[in-house]
Regions:
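Hot-dog-fold acyl-thioester-processing enzymes
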Residues: 1-54, 110-132
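Hydrophobic beta-strand-centered segment that forms part of the acyl-chain substrate-binding groove
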Residues: 35-71, 75-78, 98
Length: 132
């Protein structure tokens, strides 16, 4: 399991005083950086090889600015030939889950416009002690 702490920012909130519905999607993406680095250690544009093809997001409770910090937990739910499914959750300090979702990303050769098999060395890192 990969974990990432997010500081809730005032601009994450909306007119009603709770976090805007897009904030968790941005937090989840930020938390995926560690996974992006497994696929592309330099995080260079030239080496970018992941396409997000599906996203789900469910809200379990309101998230207030006063919470100040959210922990995003990410796990590899499925590792296919050329795709990876990640499940993510946003947790308050008391351990309660306030949002959860999943994404499917495809390992892709942008130059040749085709999917590629995820290499074994990447698979090992993804499924290592923190991957599942």
């Amino acid at each position: 399991m990969f974990t990432h702490k997010i500081q809730i920012r005032i601009f994450d909130t909306d007119f009603l005083g709770h976090c805007h519905h897009l904030a968790p999607a941005m937090w989840f993406e930020e938390a995926r950086n560690e996974i992006f680095e497994i696929f592309n250690p330099s995080m260079s544009r030239e080496g970018w090889n992941l396409l997000l093809v599906h996203i789900d997001l469910d809200f379990k409770a309101q998230i207030q600015f006063t919470e100040r910090e959210i922990e995003i937990r990410t796990r590899v739910a499925r590792l296919g030939n050329s795709s990876i499914t990640l499940e993510q959750g946003a947790y308050l300090r008391d351990g309660s889950c306030v949002a959860e979702g999943s994404v499917v990303m495809v390992y892709y050769d942008l130059k040749n416009q085709k999917t590629m098999r995820i290499p074994d060395e990447i698979r090992e890192k993804l499924l290592g002690e923190r991957g599942q």
